[in-house]
A protein has these predicted regions:
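Alpha-helical transmembrane segments of compact multi-pass small-molecule transporters, enriched
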Residues: 40-44, 92-106, 121-122, 181-185, ...
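Hydrophobic/small/kink-forming positions within alpha-helical transmembrane segments
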Residues: 14, 18, 46, 67, ...
Length: 306
């Protein structure tokens, strides 16, 4: 049963990845977008729990850690994309299951049997093949530190989800704590970035106040971006896929082995790859095709092992 929850979660996160990919081509404020994603999760979790009436417990406070490390992972990932090679950061985002397997063994003594280990390695290898790019080299690892932080933070987010289930925390209250924490952090981040942008614009305006003819092009450029309200509401729409996935993640971790659940969820990248191939008409490289095949073989081994 855990596999069905994890696979359904991967589909939801795959849809989220597709929406993120589409949104990345638009002139928007990413912090405001992510604020919308987490604000949507807050509202949906709160409303559903009004009817579901899931109980609150001390374990629900683990959701604060989930929100914190989710914020750190997203912030580090975007920072890595800004200062480093996109292909390198993308590769690190495929490695959190490795962190999860190692820490789950250290913390809780969880072990994989031979077939589970084989399936895990094949799936991780397939994910890395999909994310690998020929422009990655040992001589050019700029931004690698942000990729490592991203990898660890995503892994700890998964482990926090598992810990919440071990403490008997209900899904909706835990997610509500996670999304409230994330909303606050992304809201602060958006506010600070907006203040910095306003300060920079004021400096430019002061320097160019005697050149009125040259002050209109920047304004026209700014108008091409999405408005704050449009970005926020789009983020809230994307957030529906995010919380749908998270509502499936927690029962998957409750029923399954932590590392295996994490690696199945990480296969959401496959759906983004299929979207790029069949909707955007992008051709698979040999590595991507091989990685897709490996990942599917790994899932087959995992099902046979079960």
């Amino acid at each position: 049963m855990w596999f069905l929850f994890a696979a359904a979660s991967a589909i939801c996160f795959g849809l989220r990845g597709i929406l993120y990919q589409w949104t990345s081509q638009r002139p928007i404020d990413r912090n405001l977008l992510l604020l919308g994603v987490y604000l949507s999760g807050t509202v949906i979790a709160a409303v559903i729990n009004l009817f579901a009436g899931q109980p609150w417990s001390e374990g629900c406070w683990v959701g604060v850690w989930m929100g914190l490390f989710s914020f750190i992972s997203n912030a580090s990932m975007y920072r890595g994309f800004a200062v480093g090679k996109a292909s390198l950061i993308a590769m690190f985002t495929g490695l959190p299951p490795v962190v999860v397997v190692i820490l789950a063994y250290v913390l809780w003594g969880e072990k994989l049997n031979l077939w589970q280990s084989m399936a895990f390695l094949v799936i991780v290898f397939g994910i890395l093949m999909i994310r690998y790019s020929n422009d990655i080299s040992l001589r050019n690892l700029q931004g690698a530190q942000w990729g490592i932080i991203t990898m660890i933070a995503f892994g700890i987010t998964d482990l926090s989800s598992k810990k919440a289930t071990m403490l008997g925390a209900a899904t909706l209250p835990t997610l509500l704590m996670m999304y409230v924490t994330g909303s606050l952090l992304f809201g602060i981040s958006w506010y600070m970035s907006r203040r910095r942008l306003a300060s920079a614009r004021a400096m430019v305006a002061a320097a160019a106040e005697d050149q009125e003819a040259e002050s209109s092009p920047p304004a026209a450029s700014a108008n091409r971006g999405w408005s704050s309200s449009k970005t926020l509401f789009w983020g809230m729409f994307v957030g529906i896929t995010n919380i749908s996935g998270m509502m499936l993640v927690m029962p998957a971790f409750k029923l399954g082995v932590t590392g295996l659940v994490s690696v199945v969820i990480a296969m959401n990248v496959v759906f983004v790859l299929l979207y790029a191939r069949f909707i955007l008409k992008e051709r698979f490289s040999r590595l991507e095709a091989g990685g897709l095949t490996c990942a599917l073989i790994g899932v087959l081994i995992l099902r046979l092992a079960a």
